[in-house]
Amino acid sequence: MKKTTSPAPSGSIQATPSSSDKRDLPADLASDLNAIDPGRRRALLAGLGAAGGAAAAGLMGPGRAMADPANLPPNVAEWSQVLGPGVDAFPYGMPSKYEKTVVRRYVEWLTATPESSINFTPLYALDGIVTPNGLCFERHHGGAAEVIPEDYRLMINGLVDRPLIFTLDDLKRFPPVSRFHFLECAANGGMEWRGAQLNGVQFTHGMVHCVQYTGVSLRRLLEEAGVKPKAKWLMVEGGDSAGMNRTLPLDKALDDCMIAYSMNGERLRTEQGYPARLVVPGFEGNMWVKWIRRIEVGDGAYMAREETSKYTDLMPDGRSRRFTWEMDCKSVITSPCPELPCRKKGPQVIKGLAWSGRGKIARVDVTVDGGRNWHQARLEDPIMSKCLTRFYLDGWEWNGDTAYLQSRAIDETGYVQPEMAALQAVRGVNSVYHNNAIQTWRINPTGEVENVRLA
């Protein structure tokens, strides 16, 4: 392993895990949790990691260790002795039945209703950088809208020369563009601000996914409408029952935004905005308005609900931190993690993901001793702007001792992923959004992995 010359972060190697039945949650989340029966509350908190752990067990745990000798060499396995399903069995291909535990997961007590809530991508179970469409996390404010494609319309109005209305077929007549980008909810990791809370990478970092989007450049649509010189902002509005809307700077809209109608080569899923959504590379997911139905061009910010009372952070001095669109450089180790413990001593490959809303990932460093020594990870091609990047630390020998794993990403602008203490020094402990702090996993001598906060 190659050591870097960058300094190790200060601080003693003392874990501060939260108890399973007493967690320091943000006030709005704590009130929901406190309304639950104490016994069920303890089971939910303790079981968050177990949900992913059950999935991990199906992948690499006792089920794999207890192989049927009749199917092992030199015997002929049972599946080699019978005809399998024909080509007419699955008109739309599905995952293997043995991967049924790899699913998006939903935390019941997180919100009052699932129609205005979120579920989480199983990052621990994925390889490469592309998220399968069926595993991309969902965030809804009024449930997923079932839009009839023939009735779909996108309006552009306001400070334009020619107000326009596009059908879905109209959008598809424009020259298509395809790009890979990550989409991250601004609240990804938000529950970890005050200490280690959720024991599983699916729950600490699972509000992110990465796909290839195909659609039409938003710039081309605005050029068709003819934007007036005094225009500076857009108000983008969705067709869901919540009427989700956000303000978007015109400069960003003219840069790299698109109206997407496909993801990973197929039409958008309903929960991802079918038949069309806004793609805002590098910006927080709340701005990627789904089921987009209207774009109003104006000369001032619209101060929508989702950018004033919501998606803002209260600073220690009483001011509000808002219009924080860009997602900062971030990384997380996805193996080992609470869902994927170390089963054997010896050589290990540490795997993870890094991303930045500012551009490409330039480097990722990994420590196994809580920051005393850092080692430069191997980045896997392709490395693309505003896209997930896969990293590996090869050849780490785990001898069974307690280890503290962290990753630290650096993007092409030179921005370095911070420790939580550095974020809290500036933003206090009341934040929910834009937590890009370094994550710590503790590997215990048993091989089990847990989410901890170093003192």
Identify the residue ranges that each predicted region occupies.
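N-terminal secretory signal peptides
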Residues: 1-39, 57, 66
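Residue-level detector of intrinsically disordered/flexible regions characterized by low predicted structural confidence
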Residues: 4-5, 15, 24, 62, ...
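N-terminal export signals
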Residues: 36, 42-67
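Generic alpha-helical secondary-structure signal
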Residues: 38, 46-47, 221, 367
